[in-house]
A protein has these predicted regions:
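C-terminal transmembrane-helix exit sites in multi-pass transporters
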Residues: 120-142, 262-281
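Structural signature of hydrophobic alpha-helical transmembrane segments
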Residues: 51-63, 102-120, 162-175, 220-235, ...
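Hydrophobic transmembrane alpha-helices of multi-pass small-molecule transport proteins
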Residues: 139-156, 279-298
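Helix-helix packing/entry segments at the starts of transmembrane helices
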Residues: 114-119, 186-202, 238-269
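Transmembrane alpha-helices of multi-pass small-molecule transport proteins
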Residues: 2-12, 24-25, 49-96, 175-178, ...
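Loop-to-transmembrane-helix transition segments
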Residues: 24-32, 71, 76-100, 164-172, ...
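Transmembrane alpha-helical segments that form core, pore/gating elements
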Residues: 44, 52, 67, 160-219, ...
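Hydrophobic/small/kink-forming positions within alpha-helical transmembrane segments
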Residues: 33-41, 68, 91-99, 121-126, ...
Length: 312
């Protein structure tokens, strides 16, 4: 989300990565988060002169170009799927979450929006429990509850501290979480490249529909330069995150995603002069701490299940 804090598709990481690969995976993930924060900053800058939908569409071009190259190399077999409806649904959710986030950051400081977007993993945990019937222990439920408290501290609803558009980030997080749940279904049946292709094609198609009604020709200058740079940066960020999960365990590199808040704060200050206030930092610290703890508990539970399976 910010625009996306996870890869565009479910990727099954190496089962037994070498120690050096774990370090490389962390480096890839850190690089991806650095670029994602840069892309979010570019998007916020562009919304000052262009319609948010046009900005999201322009960002999508990088991923779409990559898919066209993939289709040229491997042919239409890339689009072979066992569940087209779910693939289309996932593409729609991806477009929705990205659009809502970009609209939100046109009003809300980048660091605040990124902090709130990290509520998505907690929503994924809840959906996993209620939709996928995944067992969730009491400690993870407590972590989820505390994480939501942290989100409320950042937003402070009814106090007029943050622009109401921050609620769009919450809706974007819900869309993102739903997308991740769909990804879990698709991971067992479709290839990663298939999911990436459908996400890019469906998302681009949806975002193109309103384009004739909101299109604005950018004036020559910084806006054009940023438009040209944003799409390749977004595509490279996606690639780095995917490579990270290919060469290392997801549980090793996932906490690095929270560095997005650091980069978002840095860019927000350097470009827009925005700095989070004291309570935003407190809320963000709570969200990140409980998020990392949730990842730790998932790792413990996964190891326990593997041990039980091997003993059986």
């Amino acid at each position: 989300m910010g625009v996306s804090i996870e890869p565009a598709s479910p990727v099954i990481p190496s089962k037994d990565p070498r120690p050096l690969q774990s370090g490389l995976g962390i480096a890839y993930m850190a690089g991806g988060m650095f670029l994602f924060a840069a892309v979010d900053t570019m998007a916020k800058f562009l919304t000052e002169t262009l319609h948010p939908l046009q900005v999201v569409w322009s960002r999508q071009l990088g991923l779409l170009l990559g898919v066209f190259i993939l289709l040229a190399i491997k042919g239409t077999s890339v689009l072979a799927t066992k569940n087209k409806k779910l693939q289309i649904t996932r593409g729609g959710l991806a477009a929705c979450s990205a659009t809502l986030f970009i609209v939100a950051v046109s009003y809300v400081p980048l660091a605040d929006a990124v902090a709130v977007s990290f509520v998505a993993p907690f929503i994924v945990t809840m959906l996993g429990a209620f939709v996928l019937r995944e067992p969730v222990g009491i400690r993870r439920w407590i972590a989820v509850t505390i994480g939501f408290v942290g989100t409320l501290i950042v937003i402070r609803p009814g106090m007029g501290v943050i622009h109401p558009a921050v609620m769009l980030v919450l809706v974007a997080a819900i869309c993102f979480a739903l997308r991740q749940v769909v990804s879990r279904y698709l991971a067992g049946s479709d290839r990663t490249e298939t999911t990436v292709a459908y996400t890019a094609l469906v998302g681009s198609f949806i975002l193109t529909i309103p384009l004739p009604f909101i299109w604005q020709w950018p004036t020559p200058g910084p806006v054009v330069v940023v438009l040209l740079v944003m799409a390749p940066c977004a595509a490279l960020a996606e690639l780095l995150v995917i490579k990270s999960l290919e060469v290392s365990q997801a549980v090793v590199v996932a906490p690095v995603q929270y560095s997005l808040l650091i980069w978002g704060t840095m860019y927000g200050y350097l470009v827009f002069g925005h700095l989070p206030d004291f309570w935003t930092w407190i809320g963000a610290l709570i969200i990140v701490s409980t998020g990392v703890y949730t990842l730790h508990r998932e790792r413990v539970v996964t190891r326990r299940r593997k041990a039980e399976t091997q003993d059986a």
